[in-house]
Amino acid sequence: MTEQKRPVLTLKRKTEGETPTRSRKTIINVTTPPKWKVKKQKLAEKAAREAELTAKKAQARQALSIYLNLPTLDEAVNTLKPWWPGLFDGDTPRLLACGIRDVLLEDVAQRNIPLSHKKLRRALKAITRSESYLCAMKAGACRYDTEGYVTEHISQEEEVYAAERLDKIRRQNRIKAELQAVLDEQ
């Protein structure tokens, strides 16, 4: 007879196409851990998350502290407008003449205006670094003095410089917003 054609039954048969599964020394968790242990693990995870968030907030606070805290454009306009209305077209600041800070400081001393040098400097920085002011700096635009008279015109180099400053300020504002979002998250 042809015994070679009959399948031979063996105990150590290999399965075709499947990877062998390890059945010895596998750990089977039959019971769940006690509630106090689960609670302790959750508290430890929560403490780790809070510590990480605190560290992230401290880092964001430190990174945010390098930027100047200038007043808003409206506050700066309201600071200077009562004393020098010629610098503004309604509530919009006009382009300021070069060297206007020294002129304003002399005017403060001469007229005894209750405005400190620091407040004046910060207000001028807030105005000249605002997006609306830098966008208005186009070649051929006029610069104004304290009385509202035209003193000079914007050159091509000043327009290029204003565009670069505008890009830099927008980048800084985007970074500030991201850092502030980190500080505000809970």
UniProtKB/Swiss-Prot annotation:
Organism annotation: Escherichia coli
Sequence similarity: Belongs to the FinO family.
UniProt keyword Transit peptide, yes or no: no
Keywords, sorted A to Z: Conjugation, Plasmid, Repressor, RNA-binding, Transcription, Transcription regulation
Pfam family, one: ProQ
Highest taxon of the lineage: Bacteria
Signal peptide: none
Gene this chain is encoded by: finO
Listed transmembrane segments: none
Keyword Plastid: no
Upper lineage: Bacteria, Pseudomonadati, Pseudomonadota, Gammaproteobacteria, Enterobacterales
Gene3D superfamilies: ProQ/FinO domain
Region (Disordered): 1-22
Biological function: One of the components on the FinOP fertility inhibition complex, which inhibits the expression of traJ gene, which in turn regulates the expression of some 20 transfer genes. The transfer genes are responsible for the process, called conjugal transfer, in which DNA is transmitted from one bacterial host to another. RNA-binding that interacts with the traJ mRNA and its antisense RNA, finP, stabilizing finP against endonucleolytic degradation and facilitating sense-antisense RNA recognition.
GO terms of molecular function: RNA binding
Entry protein name: Fertility inhibition protein
